[in-house]
Amino acid sequence: KFSRLKNQFFFFMKKKFGWEKVNNNWAAVCGGCVGMTFIYERPDLMKKISQRFLDIMYEYLNGFGDDGACAEGLDYWIYGFGYFLYFADVYREFTGGQTDLLDDEKVKYIAQFQQNMYLSGNAAISFSDSSRYAYFERGMTDYLKTYYGKEIIPPDNKFSCEKPACSRFAHFIRSYLWRDEYKAYNQDDDFIFYPDAQWYIRKLNSFGFAAKGGNNGESHNHNDIGSFIIAYEGKQIFADIGAGEYTSDYFSENRYKYLCTSSLGHSVPIINGYAQKDGIEYNAEIIKADKDEFCLDISGAYGIEEVRAVIRKFEIMSDTVILTDEFKIEGERCNIIERFISVINPEYI
């Protein structure tokens, strides 16, 4: 058994892997796991190739804008940033404190991402391949609170995850080793805007609201430019379905035939019979983003020549959201279907 493991270390040193050059969670997960294995099992070899693992971690961080938003969604923040954190902790100890990957302004902003994703109770922002209801990893959250102090606001402990997804040992063991007792703070009446990701978040005493621009070529992308979520009393009222069932077909060229990834499964209009298109070139233009209003042009998501502008404006009040869509279309054809997604059956009053 040891001989087989020994051969794997030298095999790794002679070969480059695709996940070393990706700007998503996979770089941190794979690089972090392999890097920690080298530190624990072959620290002598780690001293020779440590820069390789640092480069992998920097590739991961390059997938974030300076605002710290994880365009892949909260679930992949937990996955990717979790393993980045675990590696950073072990590597800091390995270097005797000389290299601290967490001592960085951008990394601090990334660490704050989780606390901004809770809208009402554990009804969360489920953009991209994420879940409508969030359960946080207690160990990594408490560690970040200890490290960054008041900059980190832990969610309510009743929403902590006691059974890590896929039985991931790294999350599980740290939920015991790093567990601490921190008070959850109320985030009512809060406003967050991520300018790079173009995510808008408004939390009030009565409800939580989120909307997004961005582009349709993001990692774990959904065609969802202009989509929004309204959460109330712990439930998404206007919903983002979130991730679909993971199959090979879901990650193939057929991805946008699924309702949850297509714009047909999001609260955005159908214009002249067309849904939004996928690709980084299909994007939004932000017009205004402040505490009371979020306004953007989503026409670029459709790639329709005669559609000159689709100005979507959200006005946020204490107990109301007013949505106004303004269409500028050339030619005689102007067929608009407004589409709203909810998992709650409407009732006539």
Describe each PLM feature range.
Residues 79-237:
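Carbohydrate-active enzyme catalytic cores, enriched for enzymes
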Residues 96, 178-349:
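Non-catalytic C-terminal accessory modules of carbohydrate-active enzymes
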Residues 1-75, 173, 177-184:
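Active-site lining segments of carbohydrate-active enzymes
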Residues 34, 114, 325:
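A residue-level signal for conserved active-site and pocket-lining positions in enzyme catalytic cores
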Residues 28, 47-54, 71-74, 78-85, ...:
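Conserved structured core elements
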Residues 14-25, 29-33, 71-85, 121-147, ...:
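Carbohydrate-binding/catalytic loop surfaces
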Residues 1-24, 138-159, 222-225, 231-246, ...:
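Short, charged N-terminal helix-start/capping segments
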